[in-house]
């Protein structure tokens, strides 16, 4: 029997080697991280998953971490999980409330319990109604803009432009069938889920990517499914974030010697160096903001600066000005 109970501590884990991604579909590829543990990595070439997910064989039950943005992509995730584990999906974890991680919930019920923090469930109820109403009125314009951007993209820009077109196509395709499916189990602080073979620890990370994010730890395997607390080779988005709190939380995960593999919400599976890289990114932006405030530079000028050379190759460059605005606002308050 699966037992769920609150807990606070991490356990010691051992190092697990990386596995190469297995052949996947238009929407995602599957990468085995350890026995019974897989990452489902979004396919950037026009796929509709948009974010990464996880599949865990608990032994007698199957757990999925994050549910993708598009219900059809989520249906494929569900089939893949059940083929790999030979058990139906019993638990789906929502790492946070953003659409690209929760709109696949509907394909897992009935049958699975959807789990999130209390704050995430409440925010999902409010935000999804507002966002879906806006999308139904505006998705046509957004989709056409994405097509135009792809047509005008340079050779270096084209690959990412294909990904963004897939994002808007996935939204457009899903809107007629979308049913907001809220979590039925919520928790605060932390939650263990124990299976006959493997256990996972859900940790609430407050004021990181959003006001409440979930990171899932497999202590014995040394694996962390980070949700959008971690982006790899992509600019994070600080629109809902507290950059300083996020940085401190990332430093905690970096300092945990038991953790060796990190699955980001966006980007490839990575080791600890990716965590430190994102910490450095936040430090760099904070330093730029501090200097701008000291020089009384207007925020409208500050946010127009170019991406630093070391981050030029990262995707999601459209988030950079938003991130500058966020750290500038924080620096002004000091």
Role assignments for model-derived ranges:
Residues 31-80, 214-226:
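Conserved beta-strand hairpin/beta-sheet module of binuclear metal-dependent hydrolase folds
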Residues 10-26:
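Bacterial Sec-dependent signal peptides at the C-terminal "C-region" and cleavage site
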Residues 60-61, 71-116, 256-258:
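Active-site metal-binding motif and surrounding structural segment of the metallo-beta-lactamase
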Residues 291-334:
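C-terminal regulatory/interaction regions
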């Amino acid at each position: 029997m699966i037992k769920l109970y609150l807990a606070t501590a991490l356990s010691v884990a051992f190092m697990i080697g990386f596995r190469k991604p297995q052949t996947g579909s238009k929407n995602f590829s599957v990468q085995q991280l350890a026995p019974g543990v897989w990452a489902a990595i979004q396919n950037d070439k026009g796929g509709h998953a948009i974010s990464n997910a996880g599949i865990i064989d608990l032994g007698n039950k199957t757990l999925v971490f994050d549910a993708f943005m598009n219900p059809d992509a989520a249906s494929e995730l569900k089939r893949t999980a059940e083929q790999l584990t030979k058990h139906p999906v019993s638990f789906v974890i929502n790492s946070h409330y953003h659409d690209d991680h929760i709109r696949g919930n509907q394909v897992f019920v009935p049958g699975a319990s959807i789990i999130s923090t209390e704050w995430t469930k409440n925010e999902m109820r409010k935000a999804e109604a507002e966002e879906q109403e806006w999308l139904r009125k505006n998705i046509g314009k957004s989709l056409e803009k994405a097509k135009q951007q792809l047509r005008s993209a340079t050779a270096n820009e084209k690959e990412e432009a294909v990904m963004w077109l897939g994002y808007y196509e996935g939204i457009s395709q899903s809107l007629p069938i979308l049913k907001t499916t809220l979590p039925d189990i919520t928790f605060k602080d932390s939650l263990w889920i124990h299976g006959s073979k493997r256990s996972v620890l859900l940790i609430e990370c407050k004021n990181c990517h959003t006001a409440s994010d979930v990171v899932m730890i497999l202590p014995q395997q040394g694996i962390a499914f980070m949700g959008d607390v971690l982006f790899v080779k992509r600019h994070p988005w600080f629109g809902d974030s507290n950059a300083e709190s996020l940085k401190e939380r990332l430093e905690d995960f970096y300092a945990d010697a038991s953790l060796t593999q990190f699955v980001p919400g966006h980007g490839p599976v990575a080791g600890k160096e990716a965590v430190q890289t994102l910490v450095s990114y936040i430090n760099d932006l904070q330093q730029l903001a501090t200097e701008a405030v000291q020089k009384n530079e207007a925020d409208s000028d500050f946010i127009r600066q170019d991406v630093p050379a070391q981050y030029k190759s990262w995707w999601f460059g459209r988030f950079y000005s938003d991130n500058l605005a966020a750290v500038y606002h924080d620096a002004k308050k000091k």
